[in-house]
């Protein structure tokens, strides 16, 4: 699972995912990429599930780049606790994904294999996505 080694603060402010991404919008490393069409928080478990789906379909051939990282801790208060008395404890780690962010990239496999692997990864994520080719963003 992806999570930061250490953070300056345990409980950060919430980062909004509305609007378009400023960076990380082009396929830089691989030949094909998975680009988000919506904004959302993507948990480290969802990122890992998408990675496993891709690598298993590609049978460990080729290379997969994960272009997002879960930096933000999402907090939650325990059940049946009254309002107030501070912020809840960190529950999970999420990556903030805005519209147009390239989340995954693939290289080193045939085009059909890459497209199917990215399609499988798409179904593991809570955002609408599209598959883009390098240079055709």
UniProtKB/Swiss-Prot annotation:
Coiled coil: none
Sorted UniProt keywords: Ribonucleoprotein, Ribosomal protein, RNA-binding, rRNA-binding, tRNA-binding
Superkingdom, taxonomy of origin: Bacteria
A GO biological process held by the record: translation
GO molecular function, one term: rRNA binding
A single cellular component GO annotation: cytosolic large ribosomal subunit
InterPro entries from the UniProt entry: Ribosomal_uL16 (IPR047873), Ribosomal_uL16_bact-type (IPR000114), Ribosomal_uL16_CS (IPR020798), Ribosomal_uL16_dom (IPR016180), Ribosomal_uL16_sf (IPR036920)
Keyword ATP-binding: no
The keyword Ribosomal protein belongs to this UniProt entry's keyword annotation: yes
A Pfam family the protein falls into: Ribosomal_L16
Family designation: Belongs to the universal ribosomal protein uL16 family.
Complex and partners: Part of the 50S ribosomal subunit.
Record's function text: Binds 23S rRNA and is also seen to make contacts with the A and possibly P site tRNAs.
Protein name as it appears in the record: Large ribosomal subunit protein uL16
Phylogenetic lineage: Bacteria, Bacillati, Mycoplasmatota, Mollicutes, Entomoplasmatales
